[in-house]
Amino acid sequence: FNSYLITLSNLNSKTIIALKKEGVTGMSVLMPEMKLSKQLANNNVPDYIWVGNKWELYIEGLPSIDWNRLQNFFKNLEIDLLGPQFEGVRILISPEKVMDLAKHPMITYIQQKEAPAIPENKIGIKNHRSNALRVPYAGGRNYDGDGIVVGHGDDGDIQPHIDFSGRVLANKSGPSNGAHGDHVAGTIMGAGNLDPDGEGQAPGSKLVYYDYPDNLNDIDTDYGLYGIRVTASSYSNGCNAGYTSFTRRVDLDAIQHPSLTHVFSAGNNGNSNCNYGAGSGWGNITGGHKQGKNVIATANVTGSDIIAGSSSRGPAHDGRIKPDIAALGTNVFSCLAPNDYRSITGTSMACPGIAGVLAQLYDAYRQNNNGVDPEGGLMRALLTNNADDLGNPGPDFKYGYGRVNGLRAAKAIEMNWFIKDTIAQNETDTIDIPV
């Protein structure tokens, strides 16, 4: 079953009969309280939304809404319009006037502002089978991510490092706030020029570097401008935040930019209770955007494929499988400025491992398909369905579909072991698969 939000200028028995003929099985009026996020509806709001004596909220309206025509309505409720965001606008409003806002027929959704961002922090390339993909000599695959551009959002300016030389297409960040971004960037695309043990997953790939979350906010422009096909974000966005406006935004990116894949860390709250309902240790993925249906959230495993105690567990807020995949995130050896290296642990280090392997797989697809880009949905399917199963049989809430196996995914690309097809309601489609 699918749900839709519709507007009707005239609801009568004739309209209801017509809708039933189209297969509509039920309808309800969108009441004001139904427009509120769970936190607002339960009056369980986080401290960070307070600005003076008002709340900072995000609101959406019907597609036909003209926010400028609501100026008088906003003025009567003493609402401050802060500016556009995603598909709606940000506002400041007194808590007691939120329900009055929700009663407006053009308003469809109201939620608290997004949670503030907090960074999450030679075995990897072997465990991920990344090394087998990029052998450059005769008979090797040579999938090193050449020509693939990764949009990496992190903690401010990455410092000069010999491992990045000539492959940072643009640095759109502000001043440096630490070494987190340097280490993550090295795990994605470090060349290992000074120390081969510090080589990243895709040493042929290129980087566009941002202050997080501008790698997500700017994708509508930079997908075409720089050719970004993979993003990497090792930042939290609230704990078990549910399906937020930011989640919807990154899911829409997959539709509007079909060859794009967003990669996130799952989070480092593995022992936390984030009010999912199963107690400590479950339902603590650190973010709304990580819970998207068209994105990858990455768990942290050790070099012996054991889930790290700190690695956030699923399920998603609505019960879906999260994390999606696991990668080495414990004692990852990577770049540190200036021209240095260090081992760091966290899902922050697992996320770039997946982003780097994806860059290699995009490279593999191009090399085997006359330079054509794959669809992001196919790459996510290849990544998860070719993982090495860990933990409980099948996908689970600790490891997702298992630890990434880049070699197996690349072989599926080379052998064309995938089918794209469509089917309509009540139709039958038969596909023969040789075994």
Q: Residues of each region from the PLM?
A:
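C-terminal subdomain of the subtilisin-like protease fold in secreted/lumenal serine endopeptidases
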Residues: 198, 209, 363-434
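Solvent-exposed, polar/charged alpha-helical surfaces in well-ordered, non-transmembrane soluble domains
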Residues: 13, 17, 68, 72, ...
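Subtilisin-like serine protease catalytic core
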Residues: 68, 133-217, 226-229, 240-243, ...
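Hydrolase catalytic cores
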Residues: 187, 327-393
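Substrate-binding/access-modulating region of protease and related hydrolase catalytic domains
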Residues: 66-69, 96, 191-196, 208-293, ...
